[in-house]
Amino acid sequence: MVKLAIDMMGGDNAPDIVLEAVQKAVEDFKNLEIMLFGDEKKYNLNHERIEFRHCSEKIEMEDEPVRAIKRKKDSSMVKMAEAVKSGEADGCVSAGNTGALMSVGLFIVGRIKGVARPALVVTLPTIDGKGFVFLDVGANADAKPEHLLQYAQLGDIYAQKIRGIDNPKISLLNIGTEPAKGNSLTKKSFELLNQDHSLNFVGNIEAKTLMDGDTDVVVTDGYTGNMVLKNLEGTAKSIGKMLKDTIMSSTKNKLAGAILKKDLAEFAKKMDYSEYGGSVLLGLEGTVVKAHGSSNAKAFYSAIRQAKIAGEQNIVQTMKETVGESNE
């Protein structure tokens, strides 16, 4: 049985989409128990595997992260993290304030001994539909080569345990594919990755080929990773808008759009990384999953499923035994 703590109040569309996703999750997964934290006035579920705990406070999207977790000790997000810290829950899921969630992850759930910097990881779409693991996308703006090596080790475990990929191919994001390309960070990181024979490091990868499906894990610093992620999000939205405008521009195009409706929907689904779940803060003593702030019920359900798989695969213990112990 996997037990997850969930923030009912976090996100733009909470609590409605959270409640809908939780209800579907406990119906679909018979080995799942939920601890739900939020306002009792807005709780309306009744299921034997859902335990509700009232919280009198909520961390808002605009709250300053560290100050919020210190001042709002009875908030749904803080109480959720405390449940993971105490061992009551195997992991947690929230669509709330990203900075606050990273703060409760670091200061309440806690970092695995030997992990220098936790990393925020997402799974992004590829042309062939299989996707790739991408980290760090914003946990740490600055990074050292040793941190990128550790990100690769964490990403390797994540790709194996969560995505079911044997011997995943690992690449370093750079401005060229040649080993000598890049700045001091990427050059030294390349050396370290190449020397770690426990990893299937296949070299550098350029941003323009990220979605080609040639690799399984891509490693970069949080500053670069966050910009790449937001660029991909923006590009996908722009392409969608351009397609819509083109289809609506004439009767002929509208007819073509009606014929291609199913194919266009499939394309949109393939480009939507929320299909793969939320982003995960790797390197902590428990699984911490961040669903997108504007998640609908389907996306939040995917984040719950992702956290459940992490619990089933005992990913935290694997990270302790490999990355943690090797760096103590």
UniProtKB/Swiss-Prot annotation:
EC number(s) recorded for this UniProt protein: 2.3.1.274
Superkingdom of the organism of origin: Bacteria
GO molecular function, one term: phosphate:acyl-[acyl carrier protein] acyltransferase activity
Catalytic activity entry: a fatty acyl-[ACP] + phosphate = an acyl phosphate + holo-[ACP]
GO biological process: fatty acid biosynthetic process; phospholipid biosynthetic process
Subcellular location(s) per record: Cytoplasm
Similarity comment: family membership: Belongs to the PlsX family.
PANTHER family in the record: FATTY ACID/PHOSPHOLIPID SYNTHESIS PROTEIN PLSX (PTHR30100), PHOSPHATE ACYLTRANSFERASE (PTHR30100:SF1)
Entry protein name: Phosphate acyltransferase
Organism: Staphylococcus aureus (strain JH9)
Higher taxonomy: Bacteria, Bacillati, Bacillota, Bacilli, Bacillales
